[in-house]
Swiss-Prot record:
Any GO CC annotation of this UniProt entry: cytosolic small ribosomal subunit
Phylogenetic lineage: Eukaryota, Viridiplantae, Streptophyta, Embryophyta, Tracheophyta
Domain KH type-2: 43-118
Keyword Acyltransferase: no
Species of provenance: Buxus microphylla (Littleleaf boxwood)
Assembly information from the UniProt record: Part of the 30S ribosomal subunit.
Main localization category: plastid
Entry similarity comment: Belongs to the universal ribosomal protein uS3 family.
Recorded superkingdom: Eukaryota
GO term, biological process aspect, one: translation
Protein's name in the database: Small ribosomal subunit protein uS3c
Amino acid sequence: MGQKINPLGFRLGTTQGHHSLWFAQPKSYSEGLQEDQKIRDCIKNYVQKNMRISSGAEGIARIEIQKRIDLIQVIIYMGFPKLLIEGRPRGVEELQINVQKEFNSVNRKLNIAITRIAKPYGQPNILAEFIAGQLKNRVSFRKAMKKAIELTEQADTKGIQIQIAGRIDGKEIARVEWIREGRVPLQTIRAKIYYCSYTVRTIYGVLGIKIWIFVDEE
């Protein structure tokens, strides 16, 4: 069998950047990592609870964390920030206070900024959430995959591959189904590829969704 490497880790330093930007001493490195994870989880939970459309979708493409001695800067890249901010002018402040409560750092200030993504459906996380929503509503998986591909065409990408694994349509035996449109060169390091794997809980069991999006060649 072909061994698949994670396309993001494979391209770190060429077309992919890190989502956490900070230095730490070896002793305190693991604490820093756990702190990052806490911040990300806290933000995702808050967004899930407070989205205007309560579909369980977050619309978060990625969360970047930059740390300095006295400041933690968090940048949330969202596809549809309006759904979170509209009607609640203090939405970002509330979120900031929530995250600050989570970890009690006395001497560090936390700053959260939300950035809107121009083409949300060019982001695999947002697409995966869309497919997950469709599968939960018992839409046929083929229909969901085709609709997702139509959405990426608006974001003028060069290729997309979607894979769904598990008890598809509630069948007894788990299987893997996939669909590809355009080019997805996984072995070309200079090819900019966005990737995500997403777990969705349906009434039949857990399904795994993987999405590769080929954006551009550098």
